[in-house]
Amino acid sequence: MLPASAYTRRGATIAGQELTGLLDARKVLDLFRDGATVVLQGLHRYWPPLTRLVADLELELGHPCQANAYLTPPGNQGFAVHSDSHDVFVFQTAGSKLWEVHGPDGAEEVLLEPGVSMYLPTGTPHAARAQDTVSLHVTIGVNQLTWRGLVRRSLEPLLAEVSDDHLPAGHLDDPSRLREGLAARLEELADRVRGLDAAEAVERETTRFLTTRPARLSGGLLGALAEDRLADDTVLRRRPGPCVLREDGDRLRVLLGDRVLTVPGRLRPALERVRGADELTPADLDLDPQSRLVLCRRLVREGLLSPVDR
């Protein structure tokens, strides 16, 4: 792994403030010629096909995902044998790479060519070397949520209510000063843990996941300019990503990935229609003209819909 100074530059300023971390394209090209692998970290944030793939995969799996790409010169190796703390799907897209994969029975060589993929479970030692031509592969990393994490997040509100008073002085000489107090607090905590509602904890976990995904703002400026011009026949496209509906009394909570939208419960049929469509117009919604335009403008503003320029 090269230090950032090897491929970035300094000296650029804006309003007198120095900018840091700026890529130096000439340095990158020179390093690539010398055998370095170019890593496009978090490519799903910038390339729409991967944005859609990662968004769909996160909804299917219920785990955060990310995508990176690795461009390696012919005959070179990007990293020494290493393992990752998350599951990895490898997709070879150009050239070929010979992978060294270590398992319980030792190392195995696997040749990946365009169109071939491979799954590497968490902790699998591996390395890869480009063959006779430049190699490009994409990895999808699955950052698994765990039972331990879920239990910890479920208990955090209870632990936050435990008194933060100081431990009594002299407890090193008289451990009973701690023993009795700890036993009482553990017993109280155990009673409260037994009273936890698992359904409520799961709902909080689902809401947390579906409100902490990356915002869908590509084309958002055009959408903002078009909001006031929306008409019944305006074609709107459903953006990729979450749209999960949760009833909350007579209201409806719409989990949109990076936020929660709360609307009257009567809008559920219209939102079901929006959720299941690739494209639609406000006139397609079974609402009065004013209500459907208000709803569609709001959904454009929230990033669920975007006007189609035709």
List where the protein language model places each region.
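Active-site region of the double-stranded beta-helix
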Residues: M1-V116, T124-D164
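A short, N-terminal "cap"/entry segment at the start of jelly-roll beta-barrel domains
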Residues: L2-L61, H171-A231
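Residue-level recognition of conserved beta-strand edge/terminus positions
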Residues: Y119-P121, V308
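Active-site-adjacent segment of 2-oxoglutarate/Fe(II) JmjC oxygenases
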Residues: V142, W147-V193
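Acidic, low-complexity/disordered tracts enriched in E/D and polar residues
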Residues: G195-V274, R297, V308-R310
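Short acidic, hydrophobic short linear motifs in intrinsically disordered regions
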Residues: R266, A270-D288
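Short amphipathic alpha-helical interaction segments
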Residues: D286-R301
